Amino acid sequence: MIKNKLILSLKVFLIYFVISLKVCAADSNSQDKLVVLGADEAPIKIKVFSSFTCPHCANFHKEVIPKINKNYVVSGKVQIIFIDFPLDQMAFNASKLLHCLNQEKQIKFLDIVYETQNQWTSGTNADEINNNLQQIGKSLGINSLQYNKCLNDEAISDKILNGRIDGQKKYSIDSTPTIIINEKKFKGSTSFKNIKKEIEKLI
């Protein structure tokens, strides 16, 4: 199970997060350069708070996001905003790598990481999983030097943690994925059928 394999990195991440929380809280309003799908002019904004090692997040991205995109994003009705809510160190590293890519490659990265979640998270230790993640970065043009620089970039780390802090404070996030539709927290099953009903109410 992914949960068992990442338990150590989760403990380390939680310690890191608590320490960083104090550092980042003073500047927790900076959320520039968000990862988005769709036009800024879209009247309906859907925020997706997710963690790259979360199986439910992977299912949502693979099963629901494409349908929202096809039915509402392409037509200009909806913009999807992807916000990092890492639950462990490996998800945190994946989030860092995401923000080292240009916008075109960011969406591709989301697709790859969620499509291959079972594969890249299947290492027996953190180093092996990290190497798997590095290979994904390499496929998108990130070499080993750039990858290491990315993971040690404090500005990127702060941005991710700030987004997590803001989401926790504003929406009381207690699980992933958490969906926010026009600033209202969506409750219930995150199936396309249920999301569609909420979108249709706003059109």
Residue ranges and their predicted role:
Residues 2-88, 92, 134, 138, ...:
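Extracytoplasmic thiol/disulfide redox context detector
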Residues 86-175, 180-193, 197-203:
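Cysteine-centric redox/oxidoreductase cores and disulfide-bonded domains
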